[in-house]
Structure formats: C-alpha cells, structure tokens
C-alpha cells in the first residue's frame, strides 16, 4: 500500500497488534473460509452483493461491540435483527442519507442501535454536533498517492480544517460510544 501498511499480515502479527493496541485489520478472505471461497467472484462482479452485508455478521473476531456501515437503508433492520439474535452487546448500524456506508458530514445519518437485545432508531445530524456541512465531492479520494498524503496529514494533525478530518472525528467518536469508552457523541468528539 502507499502507506506501507501490511493488510495481509500473518496471524501472529495481527494477534500482537490486537493485544498491544486493541486494534487490528482482518482481511476477510484470510480469516474466514466462506469469504475466501467467494473473494475472486466478488472482485470480478464489481457490484455490491449479499457478501457486503454478510461480512460484518460473520466477523471472525466475534466482536461484542460493532459499528457497521451499510450501503442501503433497507438492510439496516435485517442486520439489526441478526445482531439481536447473535446477542451482540452493543452495535450501531449506520447509513448516511447521502448513500455513504458510514456516518456522514454531508447530510444526516440513520442509526439503529442494538443494545442488550433491544433496538432503537435515531438520526445523527453533523451540523448539530458542530461540524461544517461537506459534500461528497470534497470527501472523495483520488489516487493512492493523494489519499496517502491526506491520511498522513490527518495522523500528523495538519488537517483540522478539512472535510476528511471532520468525517474521521465523527466516525471515531461513534466507535468510542459503541465500544463504551464514551457515553455520548458530544463527549467523544471533544
């Protein structure tokens, strides 16, 4: 990758990362046999398939807390119902009203929270949380070199006035709430 991140690291390195910093990346085809069998087909189709929905539900880490983005609002309730049956401790299923499969800064985001086998639906309004309204054009990446530079600016704290910064902060805040390290988006954003 342009950042030098090994996204296909061997199991021992992934486990070490998870133990050391509570974070790791699991390339689905390497860790889940069902995903391994369909990876090539998915790559050739170049359209969204049921595997875009199944992936988070088949999480090999068996995470108790999950922030799951979906590309279509119609999938939110079915996923939430599955998570209830899987006895997930806490999850947010999110869909930006602009079509993004994450919490967006261009519009409101629909959220279904699953917590203790109960569901509730609410909206996140980025403007009410103090973010500037963005546009999909401003959030689009470009080539891998440009994208890597923008990510490095974020890591170095040099992008505080960028739409990338806002969307990363908003989604990170949501992850902190879902992981129960913060109890509100407003507190997590600060």
Predicted regions and their residues:
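Glycine-rich anion-binding loops and their surrounding alpha/beta cores
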Residues: 2-8, 13, 19-190
């Amino acid at each position: 990758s342009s950042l030098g991140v090994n996204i296909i690291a061997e199991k021992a390195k992934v486990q070490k990362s998870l133990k050391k910093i509570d974070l790791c990346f699991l390339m689905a085809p390497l860790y889940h046999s069902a995903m391994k069998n369909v990876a090539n087909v998915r790559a050739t189709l170049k359209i969204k398939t049921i595997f875009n929905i199944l992936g988070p539900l088949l999480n090999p880490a068996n995470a108790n807390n999950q922030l799951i983005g979906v590309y279509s609002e119609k999938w939110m309730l079915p996923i939430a119902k599955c998570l209830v049956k899987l006895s997930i401790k806490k999850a947010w299923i999110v869909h930006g009203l602009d079509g993004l499969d994450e919490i967006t800064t261009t519009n409101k985001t629909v959220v279904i929270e699953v917590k203790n086998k109960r569901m509730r639906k609410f909206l996140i309004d980025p403007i009410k949380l103090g973010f500037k309204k963005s546009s999909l054009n401003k959030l689009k990446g470009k080539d891998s070199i440009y994208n890597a530079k923008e990510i490095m600016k974020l890591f170095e704290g040099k992008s505080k006035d960028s739409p990338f910064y806002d969307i990363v902060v908003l989604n990170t805040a949501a992850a902190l709430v879902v992981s129960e390290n913060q109890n509100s988006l407003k507190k997590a954003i600060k």
